Amino acid sequence: MKISANSIRTGNILVYNNDLWVVSKTPEHTQPGKGGAYVQVEMKNLKTGTKRNERFSSANYLEKAELEQKDYQFLYFEGDDLVLMDTKHFDQINISKEMLEEKLSFLTENMIVKVEFYNDKPLNIELPPTVILEISETDPVIKGATATASYKPAILENGIKVKVPQYLEIGEKIVVKTDDMTYVERAK
């Protein structure tokens, strides 16, 4: 399936130069003062693991790999693998931790994830778009900080660092985007 360069998202798997590449970083859309707009994409080769930065014109169309998606439940870690169970057929599979890279810390027991297969081989794991996590470390609340739009650093229960509004305290639960690890809102 062909997609425009502007439609490329983190986690997409592209067929580029006869290889499969996963988009590992949020693509940067750039409109220079002179010349045409382009999209800067950081990709990782699924066979070799090499990373590459590629610049595509906004007018370019790329081949997105046709993948089969299945829901799996994360059960536990086994060495360097994740053990996942198919939610329909209850089959278990082992997948390398490397597939999730820095997003591994978002994974929690019994979380439902989407595993993408290409020719019956697992290629990618998609986490839910957002997760709810507790703030374990942050600076104290500054009185009257609800009126300001400034952010302060916070460390979450899984060790990830995010910027949160000034009014949030240790122990509060927040919603965090899994694709770019940013604060969304206070959990309800």
UniProtKB/Swiss-Prot annotation:
Cross-referenced InterPro entries, in alphabetical order?
Answer: Elong-fact-P_C, NA-bd_OB-fold, Rib_uL2_dom2, Transl_elong_fac_P/YeiP, Transl_elong_KOW-like, Transl_elong_P/YeiP_cen, Transl_elong_P/YeiP_CS, Transl_elongation_fac_P
Q: Where are the transmembrane segments?
A: none
- Could you tell me which Gene3D superfamilies the record lists for this protein? 2.30.30.30, Nucleic acid-binding proteins
Gene Ontology biological process terms from the UniProt entry: peptide biosynthetic process
GO terms (molecular function) for this protein are:
translation elongation factor activity
- Keyword Cell membrane attached: no
Q: List the disulfide bonds.
A: none
Q: In which pathway does it act?
A: Protein biosynthesis; polypeptide chain elongation
Q: Which UniProt keywords apply?
A: Cytoplasm, Elongation factor, Protein biosynthesis
Q: Which GO terms describe its cellular component?
A: cytoplasm
| UniProt-annotated location(s) | Cytoplasm
Q: Which Pfam families match?
A: EFP (PF01132), EFP_N (PF08207), Elong-fact-P_C (PF09285)
* Classification via NCBIfam families: efp (TIGR00038), PRK00529.1 (NF001810)
Question: What's this chain's function?
Answer: Involved in peptide bond synthesis. Stimulates efficient translation and peptide-bond synthesis on native or reconstituted 70S ribosomes in vitro. Probably functions indirectly by altering the affinity of the ribosome for aminoacyl-tRNA, thus increasing their reactivity as acceptors for peptidyl transferase.
Recorded hits in PANTHER family, A to Z, give: ELONGATION FACTOR P, TRANSLATION ELONGATION FACTOR KOW-LIKE DOMAIN-CONTAINING PROTEIN
The UniProt similarity line reads:
Belongs to the elongation factor P family.
Write down what this protein is called.
Answer: Elongation factor P
Organism, scientific name: Rickettsia africae (strain ESF-5)
Q: Which gene encodes it?
A: efp
